[in-house]
Amino acid sequence: MAPFPDEVDVFTGPHWRMKQLVGLYCEKLSQTNFSNNNDFRSFLQSLCATFKEFKMHEQIENEYIIGLLQQRSCNVYNVHSDNKLSEMLSLFEKGLRSVKSENEQLNYAQQLKERLEAFTQDFLPHMKEEEEVFQPMLMQYFTYEELKDIKKQVIAQHSSQQRWDCAAEVLKGLSLWSQAEELHKAFKYADHEKTDDELEKELCSTHISQLPTEILLCLFRYLGPEDLCHCGQVCSAWSDLAKTGSLWRHLYPVRWARGDYYRGPPDDVNQEPDEEWVKSLQDEGKAYQEWDEDADVDESDASCEDSLAISAAQREKKLLNGMIQNLLPAVGSSVRSIVLAYSSTVSSKMVRQILSLCPNLTHLDLTQTDVTDSAFDSWSSLWACLSLEHLDLSGCEKLTDRTLKKLSLGLGDLASPTCSEKRSDRRAKLLKSPPSPISLLDKRSLRPTGHSRQVLIFKQWPGKLGSAPCSPTRVWVLDASELADIEDAAEWNRRRGVSTPEVRGFVETQPGGLSCCCRRRRGGFRTGFSTSYWQQQYGLGEAGCGHSTCCTGETALRTLGGLQYESYTTRGSAGAEFRTKCSSGGQLCLECDNRTDPSDGRRSLRFLSLSGCYQVTDLGLRALSQRGGLPLLEHLNLSGCLLITEVGLQELVSACPALNDEHFYYCDNINGPHADTASGCQNLQCGFRVCCRSGE
């Protein structure tokens, strides 16, 4: 029995195997007829395999035991050599290679016996020394758990040798042996002694199927998508391996269908394609759409160019269908980027299936495709595209504000949870401190507010169906400098014994008596002041207030729900702290001044291009500015968006504090934000994108 607990005894198990091998070659040494050439060569082959195992055993001990011990104790140095294993292997190989005649065999046998006896007398005491000297030192310098881990690693390395022996020759032929040594640094030994016939057969032939999974996967990384698909058809094991997620991080179906098998990260995002190349792809799509695959008429006389275009489009469609049906269900969660730019066959249904199968996308390019709003139905739930950083929808002319609303929802919500936490903190503080003064006034006695005061007016609901007639409407007038949440105000009234009116809507009043539009969950009454821009333009009584759409340029509010950045229009002014409405919950909250930059990946969009999406309006831009805005957005291209206005641009830009003016593009006819530093319209004289000046 070992003198140490078996769980932490790192030497006894492997040494038992080594001692067993010593006994086997000593027994064969006494039984081998060295006059017989077959027996002689069989014994030498057996010795080669045995001493390779000895050498690998020593290498494992050096790396996983002695090396670690030397790091803990400076008393251990230069104590573990290979015990002349390399010299013995050279002796065996020389015998197999050079000894031919019977006399040479007999002379060699005498030398071999002497060398083996000398090695045995040295090797057995060496193992005993490790068990009696090094094991106690390990117990002294390592914890019990550390020793358990060391033993597991040692056993695992010994157990992995057999398949490595078979794979060695294949790897050397592929010039990958050095890389394999770095990955494993150990061969696997046989659990049972191999027969001479097995050893001779093993030295003569190897097969790639014997490679470890890790090495096969390393080889597969050098293959293109077409070759990977071919490998997946070899056998079921390779089929599973070819569908490893790390092999399919970046997908380029359009390029692959045309023979370009690039599979690295996406190219330069600012590089526009050549117009001739775009035209050729458009011609392909046109030819494919005009071609009827079910036509009864012989179309064999079609031009060669049309035939090539149709063939390319057919390959693309077949490739897309194959990916959706066979590949993405297995690897979709690992896919990070999909580029479908200028695809002539992709449909909204295909895109919808792709997005539902690839929830962790960071890069999506649908430039100049024929998709509609329904393609993004899978983003209609909160946090559906949480990781998305790059979205290129340039030239997708059928997209409307509905897509942007889905995108805003899928990117997540920065405001909701934070606002809830802030309200809890405020309630605790309010219960400990005296409330701010609140005056209850009759509506008829309310005077217009002056330039020096900003107020919020909370109106009582005039009455419900079937209820008794109400007294004249009363309102709360709160000083903006001490303004708090509506829930806090209700709490104060409860503590003071004042009945709380049933609040259903609120009005924000700006300096000079200008008002904001009425915001409410259900239909209510508009205020007696001027109505909002959007209610005037589109009659949207239920539209949530975007503040800047109905406020003057000097006091436009921001809807940024995450970071402390000054609005473009309020930069340099010392206005009062405004309270805005959380876009998701419909409750009131303070505009948080000390909220930190989101680090959990929510609303992480950095690149957004809507170039040529002429159906997008300010409503879509406002949807993006809600739920915390786009705090990380750096690139925004709205070239060719003909229906957006200065108001909508300001709404979105105020929610994008990281926006780089050099990468901010919009129509030159709009007097929008950052007019002096933004880059203007990119679609001027562009032959394949919408532009208001395309007729010039």
Swiss-Prot record:
GO cellular component, one term: perinuclear region of cytoplasm
Binding residue positions for [2Fe-2S] cluster: 667, 681, 691-692
Domain F-box: 205-251
Any GO BP annotation: intracellular iron ion homeostasis
Keyword Ribosomal protein: no
Region (Hemerythrin-like): 1-159
Metabolic or biological pathway: Protein modification; protein ubiquitination
Compartments in which it is found: Cytoplasm, Perinuclear region; Nucleus
LRR repeat placement: 343-367, 368-395, 396-421, 582-612, 613-640, 641-666
SMART domains: FBOX, LRR_CC
Description of how the protein assembles with itself and partners: Part of a SCF (SKP1-cullin-F-box) protein ligase complex.
Comment block on domains: The hemerythrin-like region acts as an oxygen and iron sensor by binding oxygen through a diiron metal-center. In absence of oxygen and iron, the protein is ubiquitinated and degraded.
Role of this protein: Component of some SCF (SKP1-cullin-F-box) protein ligase complex that plays a central role in iron homeostasis by promoting the ubiquitination and subsequent degradation of ireb2/irp2. Upon high iron and oxygen level, it specifically recognizes and binds ireb2/irp2, promoting its ubiquitination and degradation by the proteasome.
Name of the molecule in the record: F-box/LRR-repeat protein 5
Phylogenetic classification of the source organism: Eukaryota, Metazoa, Chordata, Craniata, Vertebrata
